[in-house]
Amino acid sequence: MMIHAYQEIYVNNAQTMLGDAFDYAINTCHISGDDFVKMFVVSSFSERIENGEPACVAGKSGIELVHEIVFETMQKELNIESEVNYSRSCEYWIGWAVAYYQWYSDRSFKEIGRAHV
C-alpha cells in the first residue's frame, strides 16, 4: 500500500485548483502551456503541493496560484482580471489529470514535467 503526501479527500481540491490554474494561465493570461509548466515546476508551489501543505492543497484558488507562481518566478505582478468560467477547457483537464497523477504516483511535478518536454 502506497502512502500519499495527503489524504484522498483533498485530491479533488488539488485537481480543481491545478485545473483552474492551467486554464487561467493559458487561456486568460495567455501564458504558453510550456512556459506555465516550466514556471510551475520550478516554483516552490509545486513542491508544497507534493508535500501536501494544507495552504496549497486546499487553501488557494487556481487564480491565486497563478498570480503567486508568476510573481515568484518572474518577479512580475499580473494585472489581469479573473473571469468567471464555468466550462472546462482542455487545459483545465490537463491540470486536473496531472494533479491526480502526481498524488497517485508520488512522483514530483519536476519528474512529470520532464516527460512533457
Where are these regions (language model features)?
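Conserved small/polar residues in nucleotide/adenosyl-binding loops
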Residues: A115-V117
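Thiolate-centered catalytic microenvironments shared by cysteine-dependent enzyme domains
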Residues: K110-G113
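C-terminal alpha-helical interaction appendages
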Residues: M1-Y104
